[in-house]
């Protein structure tokens, strides 16, 4: 049975009547652990592995302490409905792209903690981010600058253990490299411009216009055409820049 700990007590999943893509990250983490309790594969590693969840919806820990020499900050996410702390510009880049990526329904920084024994040594690992995709898949992400950050063999073995635990529970685990997301490209510039207006206000009429145009279209519509339907010059500018790529 998976060792699932919320705060100092074991949590039990309440019945969910909402689609997985609409659940909170913590609720979906909890659901996966509950489903895994009858898995023979999980029982083979659960004796030395447990997943600790935060006591409430939100990050496992706040990373901004004022003592770190690394660039830290907070990203105000409309999609997550809360500010998300980051420990590097690579993590921030993942947040920015997650905010714009329509495949991402929700996401959260520092979502849980894995505790396990590897080679007789107690280990602890906190993922950089967890994302819920539109199809209900839960992704656990480790964010690195590039492949050179994985040169340490012991660290790779640590990630391999976490990846194995995720597969057994039914989560996806992958390493995301931030360097390509921060490169000076037209695509990244467009993502930056769009996310810059992520907190813009819109009403039911705007949503209706977009749904109406998409439903009537025989193929995917360019962003610029939707922007013209809304009369939004800022988004039109973003579309024009993207079109000149």
Outline where the language-model segments fall:
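Electrostatic, structured charged patches in enzyme active sites and in nucleic-acid/phosphate-binding
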Residues: 1-245
């Amino acid at each position: 049975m998976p060792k699932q700990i919320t705060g100092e007590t074991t949590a039990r999943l309440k019945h969910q009547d909402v689609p997985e893509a609409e659940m909170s990250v913590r609720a979906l983490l909890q659901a996966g652990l509950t489903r895994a309790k009858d898995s023979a594969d999980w029982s083979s590693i659960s004796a030395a592995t447990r997943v600790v969840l935060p006591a409430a919806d939100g990050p496992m820990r706040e990373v901004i302490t004022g003592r770190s020499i690394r660039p830290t900050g907070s990203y105000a996410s409309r999609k997550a409905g809360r500010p998300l702390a980051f420990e590097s510009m690579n993590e921030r880049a993942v947040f920015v792209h997650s905010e714009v990526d329509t495949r991402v329904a929700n996401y959260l920084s520092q979502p849980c903690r894995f505790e396990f024994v590897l080679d007789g040594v107690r280990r602890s690992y906190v993922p950089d981010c967890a994302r819920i995709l539109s199809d209900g898949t839960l992704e656990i992400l480790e964010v690195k600058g590039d492949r050179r950050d994985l040169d340490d063999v012991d660290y790779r073995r640590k990630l391999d253990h976490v990846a194995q635990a995720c597969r057994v529970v039914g989560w996806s685990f992958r390493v995301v490299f931030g360097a390509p997301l921060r490169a000076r490209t037209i695509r990244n510039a467009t993502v930056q411009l769009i996310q810059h207006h992520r907190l813009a206000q819109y009403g039911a009429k705007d949503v209706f216009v977009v749904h109406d145009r998409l439903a009537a279209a025989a193929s995917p519509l360019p962003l610029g055409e939707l922007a013209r339907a809304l009369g939004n010059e800022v988004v039109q500018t973003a579309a024009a820049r993207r079109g000149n790529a």
